[in-house]
From Swiss-Prot:
It comes from Saccharomyces cerevisiae (strain ATCC 204508 / S288c) (Baker's yeast). It is an enzyme of class 6 (ligase). This is Threonine--tRNA ligase, mitochondrial. Transmembrane segments: none annotated. Its EC number is 6.1.1.3. Residues 1-45 form a transit peptide. It comes from the Eukaryota. GO terms for molecular function: ATP binding; threonine-tRNA ligase activity. GO terms for biological process: mitochondrial threonyl-tRNA aminoacylation. It catalyses: tRNA(Thr) + L-threonine + ATP = L-threonyl-tRNA(Thr) + AMP + diphosphate + H(+). Keywords: Aminoacyl-tRNA synthetase, ATP-binding, Ligase, Mitochondrion, Nucleotide-binding, Protein biosynthesis, Transit peptide.
Length: 462
């Protein structure tokens, strides 16, 4: 921790306060913490999530954690729908055993599934879904399909359950109940390459543009590297088909010019895959995104489409997720930023602090700004909140504590902006606003200027 005197120019008599803050370079204890420990530390400080032994391996997202979780999903839905042509579906959490037998999961993945038995006379066995692909196959096969519908892209954000061993559970990185930005593409052989390249483009947007993770390797231009995972010992389907699928992925990798290495025997039981790997601050690697090429499930579900020559042909299925587990992605973000969220993702976007909590003019000016930025309606107002409007996470600290204490508290919580209101601000009708990462520079802005500034930050993912 550092302690320094900060002069807040917020009244005619300048106010001096001690400011306590974490330096950007972590302390020795923080820098040696595992991602799970770092996640727990930040969560406690920012009230992000909790766990309970009554539901091991499941996460309770508290309001601040839910804001981050939902914002990540909102971001991904926008990219998938309006940039890459996905249509979102919502599918059941539980299916009969017969579905999992058909897909091959019951034979190859049963140990990792939660099984449920009904209490009726039939005592039929069900399974909680560990992945969405069989459900998406049911949607594709529900009606006749034509070649001009392809590529057909489904996305799904519903929760998944996997029966991880209790000893393997670890914070947000290894859970029994989690969410993925899951998606499946049904396409023709001639469309496979362009669809996989588009999946890699979205991965580049996420890992090289929006979220600056630790570099994926020594001197790497990309923040990630790719593991090319090939046929495992236990697999379904024909060996010749597997060899063809692996050759297709290898050619795409070589053409992409991206860093990759062979990971023999670690493919999915239904097809080879490209696993996107990032490193945490301890240089340990974690799988996040994945792209999988599958010739097997379309065969097992007898999926087909009518081609231009009126013959029926089998589509190829591409499984892909960009965040991978959203919970794990959040853990790696925390490991990378230590709770210093970018403004658009921050549950603590701004805090408004009056110098004198007894001063009516200062309080009025503070509450007016908070109401404007939060953009909330009163409960007795019969008008609904408009869709697609801006709402910022802005708090007002009017605790009966010295202003220096409240400033220190805001800094420790990593608010993106501190907005101070004193006598001078009341006189000028401008707010004293300071960025989290710039402790020496202040701006005097009007309410409308702050509103426009925050909109620009969110629009540009800053």
């Amino acid at each position: 921790m550092k302690i320094q005197l900060v002069r807040w120019h917020c009244s005619r008599n300048a106010l001096w306060n001690r400011a306590f803050y974490s330096t950007r370079k972590a302390t020795k204890n923080a820098s040696s913490a595992t991602p799970a420990t770092m996640t727990s530390m930040v969560s406690q400080r920012q009230d992000l999530f909790m766990t309970d032994p009554l539901s091991p391996g499941s996460m309770f997202f508290l309001p601040n954690g839910a804001k981050i979780f939902n914002k990540l999903i909102e971001f991904m839905k926008l990219q998938q729908k309006f940039k890459f042509g996905f249509n979102e579906v919502v599918t059941p959490l539980i299916y009969k055993k017969t579905l999992w037998e058909k897909s091959g999961h019951w034979e190859n993945y049963a140990d990792d599934m939660f099984k449920v038995e009904t209490t009726d006379e039939e005592k039929e066995e069900y399974g909680l879904k560990p992945m969405n692909c069989p459900g998406h196959c049911l949607i594709f096969g529900k009606k006749d399909r034509s070649y001009n519908e392809l590529p057909l892209r489904f996305s799904d954000f519903s929760p998944l359950h996997r029966n991880e061993a209790s000893g393997a559970l670890s914070g947000l990185t290894r859970l029994r109940k989690f969410h993925q930005d899951d998606g499946h593409i049904f396409c023709t052989p001639s469309q496979v390459k362009s669809e996989i390249f588009n999946s890699l483009k979205l991965i580049d947007i996420v890992y090289n543009k929006i979220f600056p993770f630790v570099k994926g390797g020594s001197g790497a231009e990309s923040n990630y590297f790719i593991n090319f995972s090939t046929r495992p010992d236990h697999f379904i389907g024909d060996l010749k088909v597997w060899n063809h699928a692996e050759q297709v992925l290898k050619e795409i990798l070589e053409e992409s010019g991206k860093p990759w290495k062979l990971n023999p025997g670690d493919g999915a039981f239904y097809g080879p895959k490209l696993d996107i790997m990032v490193t945490d601050h301890l240089r340990k690697t974690h799988q996040v995104a994945t792209i999988q090429l599958d010739f097997q499930l379309p065969e097992r579900f007898d999926l087909k489409f009518k081609d231009q020559d009126n013959s029926y042909k089998r589509p190829i299925m591409i499984h892909r997720a960009t965040f991978g587990s959203i919970e794990r992605f959040m853990a790696l973000l925390i490991d990378s930023n230590e709770g210093r969220w970018p403004f658009w993702l921050n549950p603590y976007q701004a805090v408004i602090i009056p110098v004198n909590t007894k001063n009516v003019q200062q309080l009025d000016m503070c509450t007016a700004l908070q109401k404007k930025l939060r953009n909330e309606l009163e409960a007795d107002d019969m008008e609904p909140v408009p869709l697609n409007d801006w709402h910022f996470n802005v708090d007002l600290d009017i605790r009966n504590e010295p202003v220096g204490y409240r400033i220190k508290s805001a800094i420790l919580k990593n608010y993106s902006y501190l907005i101070i209101v004193g006598d001078e601000e009341v006189q000028l009708q401008k707010y004293n606003i300071r960025e989290r990462d710039n402790r020496k520079s202040f701006e005097k802005l009007t309410m409308s200027q702050i509103w426009e500034k925050f909109i620009e930050l969110e629009k540009n993912y800053k």
